């Protein structure tokens, strides 16, 4: 689960991280009132969407008067903000953060993720904070320092100070920077986050260290422990199809292709998408029905896939382990009739009750294309859309 920047800063503040004064706004009038309450002479008007690259996309602007704040707020609020993370369709801006300006002497980056290779939390920091951090990661990875944290000890004073010195924080401010790193680590750990990031973390002219941005992702499997985090959820920022899918315990992510995929198991789903691409097609979605799929779940999965008007064919790829192929076959038949399926459907089933499932499909009277291998299934579904 993702949250907005202003919510991330509220969270950081609870853990003692230094953040600028700021007020969220949902209208132009609220933005102006926020600027007046904060006082000048400079304000930052920031679009609030669940995507990075807002500055480059025109979603972060400086206002040097109340009138300019009003003008910028009216331009940004309601705009379709396009960044490298939103895709070409962009994301509508429904909220703003009005923030006091900062005296920026130097920008740094600090982020925390779980490293699966070492099975430890990785704290990353760089002297090259700001809008181009992704280019730094791609082209100058040596500029990103990493510390792999012992979970029993946490991020120690020595590790935090070494990281601060390593990215060039002036010695007089190393203690402050190290403390901010440790507070960010505690926020990450205590909230079951999967990502915690400050970009930029700035050094001011007076030597203070301030978090000018905040980005958090949370492990959805741990949200039952954090109702205060769940309260931050903004459904307007989520794909309606993904929200609908979650109601039926379906893992669904919409993509840009035209071949719908219905698969059981995340690994098989990814392999199926790879195979489609290998044979010249483009998957329209990731959809994992899981090991306990019912006819109802399969029907809902078809409905969700077909709401995407880009879908020109569907591939069902099932391995019957816990899931029985006859149950999937029943669901496919029910779904085809319920949605009046009018796009080509290719079905591959292997495993438990495979022959029974194939027999049910063959006797259904529906124009279902069968396949025995993944390569055959991918070949047939790609041919169906050409």
Swiss-Prot record:
GO terms for molecular function: ATP binding; magnesium ion binding; succinate-CoA ligase (ADP-forming) activity; succinate-CoA ligase (GDP-forming) activity. ATP binds at residues 46, 53-55, 99, 102, 107. Keywords: ATP-binding, Ligase, Magnesium, Metal-binding, Nucleotide-binding, Tricarboxylic acid cycle. The keyword Metal-binding applies. It catalyses: succinate + ATP + CoA = succinyl-CoA + ADP + phosphate; GTP + succinate + CoA = succinyl-CoA + GDP + phosphate. Residues 9-244 form the ATP-grasp domain. It is an enzyme of class 6 (ligase). One of its GO terms (cellular component) is cytosol. Its cofactor is Mg(2+). Mg(2+) binds at residues 199, 213. Substrate binds at residues 264, 321-323. Binds 1 Mg(2+) ion per subunit. Pfam families: ATP-grasp_2 (PF08442), Ligase_CoA (PF00549). PANTHER family: SUCCINATE--COA LIGASE [GDP-FORMING] SUBUNIT BETA, MITOCHONDRIAL, SUCCINYL-COA SYNTHETASE BETA CHAIN. Succinyl-CoA synthetase functions in the citric acid cycle (TCA), coupling the hydrolysis of succinyl-CoA to the synthesis of either ATP or GTP and thus represents the only step of substrate-level phosphorylation in the TCA. The beta subunit provides nucleotide specificity of the enzyme and binds the substrate succinate, while the binding sites for coenzyme A and phosphate are found in the alpha subunit. HAMAP family: Succ_CoA_beta. Heterotetramer of two alpha and two beta subunits. Belongs to the succinate/malate CoA ligase beta subunit family. This is Succinate--CoA ligase [ADP-forming] subunit beta. It comes from Bordetella pertussis (strain Tohama I / ATCC BAA-589 / NCTC 13251). The lineage of its organism: Bacteria, Pseudomonadati, Pseudomonadota, Betaproteobacteria, Burkholderiales. The gene is sucC.
